[in-house]
Amino acid sequence: MELYHLRTFVTVAEEQHLTRAAERLFTSQPAISAHIKALEEELRLTLFDRTPKGMQLTPAGRQLLDQAQRTLATAGDFLQAAKGMQNELLGSIRIGLNTDAEFLRLVELQAGLSAHHPQLGIEFLAGRTGDNIPALRIGRLDAAFVSGDCDEPLLESHILREEEMAIAVPHALRDQIDSPDIRALARLPWVYTSPSCAYYQLMQPLFDAHGCKPVKTMLADQEDAMKAMVAAGVGLGIMRRSEVEAAERAGQMHVLPMELPTLSLRFAYLRKRTNDPVIRAVVAELSAIWGLKDLTQREAV
């Protein structure tokens, strides 16, 4: 049995699909199938049921999954400890994104990591807060940018900044708003987000507190789509204040004069990986980029 057999087993269990597992491991589907077959033959156990819905773990597979994950983690720690003696950080990290690269300062992050850890591979994967958190839990991501509260017991998170939010108003609806009254705003059309989005979790309690529901004309979970729909007059939307103000200066929309709660931008990862050298390296770079005290020297929140 080789470590790559265990890595394949864990990846197929997470993805529940041979093709997706092959893509993650940068290999072919036949190679993935061969690894699973060899492992099952050596263990004399059936690890997966092949179903129309994908690869489902058998009871034996479920029992062995946690042990396989721990074994891989231990092997990774061993390798990093050895490389640490050589002052060289090897490996790779998959970081989930939840907004645009400029706001997250990804160019600076990539430049810093490349300068200080040239052997470290970095993957930036586009997503949303609502997708990134479960992806962290199952190991599909190593770390992620998320917005809002992060009270997941398995995760650590560091606040990078508090972002001011604002309600963006299309030109066509501006004259229909006499004052920033929540009940009156709820009667207007809205470009809304899904419940897993941090923007939804920020805005919905304001409507709930006044016993009203907004008219949801369209769903848009991507910020560029939200901005385009508001500019097109589809409805009101919630966006970062800096973006709405820039769009207002460009004559695309208006900022509603109403104070909203701020939204935390966080960097999150599994709590058990707090001392992982790769995670610590990224957190140290973020500390420098965002002008924060060294986040590796204090507890996460």
Language-model segments: what does each one mean?
Residues 40-62, 79:
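A short LG(V/I)-centered, amphipathic sequence patch enriched
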Residues 90-153, 219:
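Central regulatory/effector-binding core of bacterial HTH transcription factors
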Residues 154-190:
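Flexible hinge/capping segments at coil-to-helix
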Residues 152-159, 163, 177, 224-274, ...:
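Beta-alpha-beta core module
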Residues 21, 39-40:
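Conserved amphipathic alpha-helical core elements
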Residues 10-30:
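Short helix-boundary/capping micro-motifs
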Residues 175, 189-210, 275-284, 292-298:
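Secondary-structure junction motif
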Residues 128-133, 137-141, 146-147, 196, ...:
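Hydrophobic hinge/microswitch elements
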